[in-house]
A protein has these predicted regions:
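Short, solvent-exposed beta-strand/turn patches at coil↔beta or beta↔helix junctions
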Residues: 5-48
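Periplasmic OmpA/Pal-like peptidoglycan-binding modules at the C-termini of bacterial envelope proteins
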Residues: 6-10, 90-123
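Generic structural motif
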Residues: 33, 66, 117-121
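Solvent-exposed, acidic/flexible segments
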Residues: 34-42, 70-81
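Cysteine-centered nucleophilic/redox motifs
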Residues: 45, 77-92
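Short loop/turn segments at connectors of secondary-structure elements within structured domains
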Residues: 55-57, 82, 108
């Protein structure tokens, strides 16, 4: 890593994300330093969330620690997670979101995993 890249891990540089989903899970895989979402990506996230509005969401940010320091990997995970939460809150402002960040030396992909947690109805 050159000196000019230090501290610029999450600046959008024309790279993209991949979004895959199942009924219970949405996985956003980040390629490179991209931190923002295109309109098309936002539509994919919205489509997955449509029938989950009555659920709480859990976001797990997984950030590899191979090329950056532990503190930078945590910062990157929290920044991306907050940006993702802002996008979700624009669509569904009342949804409850919990987030965790895992910096894993063994992981090679930077990704966000969104799952649902059914709300408990108070008696």
């Amino acid at each position: 890593m050159s000196g000019k890249e230090v501290g610029v891990y999450d600046i959008a540089d024309g790279q993209k994300i991949d979004i895959t989903s199942t009924k219970n899970e949405l996985v956003i895989t980040y390629h490179g330093r991209l931190r923002s979402f295109s309109e098309e990506d936002t539509h994919k996230i919205k489509a997955w969330l449509e029938d989950k509005i009555n659920s709480n969401l859990l976001i797990e940010m997984v950030i590899p620690q191979a090329d950056i320091s532990f503190s930078d990997s945590l910062r990157l995970g929290y920044e991306r997670g907050i940006i993702l939460m802002k996008e979700i809150k624009k669509i569904y402002p009342d949804v409850v979101i919990d987030m965790s960040v895992n910096s894993a030396a063994s992981s090679t992909m930077s990704k966000a995993i969104i799952t649902t947690i059914n709300k408990k109805v108070s008696e």
